[in-house]
Amino acid sequence: MRFEQPLEEGRLLRRYKRFLADIESAGGERLTIHCPNTGSMLNCMSEGCRVWFSRSNDPKRKLPGTWELSETPQGRLACVNTARANRLVEEALLAGDIAELAGFTALRREVAYGVENSRADFRLEYPTGALFIEVKSVTLGFDETAVAAFPDAVTLRGAKHLRELAALAREGIRAVQLYCVNLSGAEAVRPADEIDPAYGKALREAAQAGVEVLAYGAEVTTEGLHLARRLPVRL
């Protein structure tokens, strides 16, 4: 996935009201841009950190740009635009780059399922039946160990999705929790039990119920993203 237009570099001044960020561009222009991430962005929003943003030419937009990438304190690039994860996964699915999920005959997005009124990011159809996928974008890396973690904030919705997937698996339906690790240099991913122990517990219970837990790491550059390789998940 290449960015639709060249990204512009800047420095973060502050993030506020969840969806707003003030930045200073490389040319000294101060802008308020859209922050497309509802998480805490723990290692992605240090004051003064390097950021990259896409600028919109749409005169109807209230904000002139969207925050796309951050440089973490460890010098890694993280894609903070969570909407990119689903697009990246879909691109990889259609290209056959996720071997464990290859061979489907149809793909649908945002499919309702479950007793808790969830919507699966993807439903794949195979000759043997359906498969449901929940995608999570991972950008959190605590230190120099190259182990990414999810979530970066307490997520009741994430735990609900795991319960829904586990219920499917118990019925004999293939269910997949897929972590799209949008953090350069990541070598593995784990649940962030120190942030949300309930989520970690739900993930391990889902795996025991038969949910397939997969992680794929992206190559993150200022030109684009590519889902490059499978990463181990440390439960």
UniProtKB/Swiss-Prot annotation:
It comes from the Bacteria. CDD domains: SfsA-like_bacterial (cd22359). Pfam families: SfsA, SfsA_N. Signal peptide: none annotated. GO terms for molecular function: DNA binding. HAMAP family: SfsA. Belongs to the SfsA family. This is Sugar fermentation stimulation protein homolog. It comes from Pseudomonas aeruginosa (strain UCBPP-PA14). The gene is sfsA.
